[in-house]
């Protein structure tokens, strides 16, 4: 398995993220993962499907919330740079990466949870 250069992944994602959503979170996070040196061959199309895909490329589930994700206080997650959050909400879900200051996907987010309603959220950390 390839080694993960978290710094390169985060540099690419932070540099290329927009100020508002482009509806392309999975593409942006996937490209960041690739910029960090990990192949995403066989990747899924929708963001929510990365819950099953990330463990195949060296990421471990470190935190999961079901149900009241929107109402959850996310401050105790202790996210580290490079952690990836996958939300199973809506048609395609959402995926984003913590850059050490904020959650980023195809845009620079104000919060991790970007939806108005509740759903499921899984957070992954690279352990390859």
Give the location of each predicted region.
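...with weaker cross-activation on analogous glycine-rich loops/strands in unrelated enzymes
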Residues: 43-117
């Amino acid at each position: 398995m390839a080694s993960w250069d978290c710094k390169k992944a985060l540099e690419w994602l932070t540099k290329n993220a927009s100020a508002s959503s482009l509806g392309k979170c999975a593409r942006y996070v996937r490209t960041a993962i690739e910029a960090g040196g990990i192949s995403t061959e066989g990747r899924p199309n929708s963001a929510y499907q990365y819950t099953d895909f990330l463990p195949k490329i060296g990421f471990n589930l470190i935190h999961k919330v079901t149900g009241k994700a929107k109402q959850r206080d996310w401050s105790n997650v202790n996210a580290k740079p490079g952690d990836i959050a996958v939300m199973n909400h809506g048609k395609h879900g959402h995926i984003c990466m913590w850059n050490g200051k904020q959650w980023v996907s195809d845009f620079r987010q104000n919060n991790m949870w970007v939806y108005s309603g509740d759903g499921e959220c899984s957070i992954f950390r690279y352990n390859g």
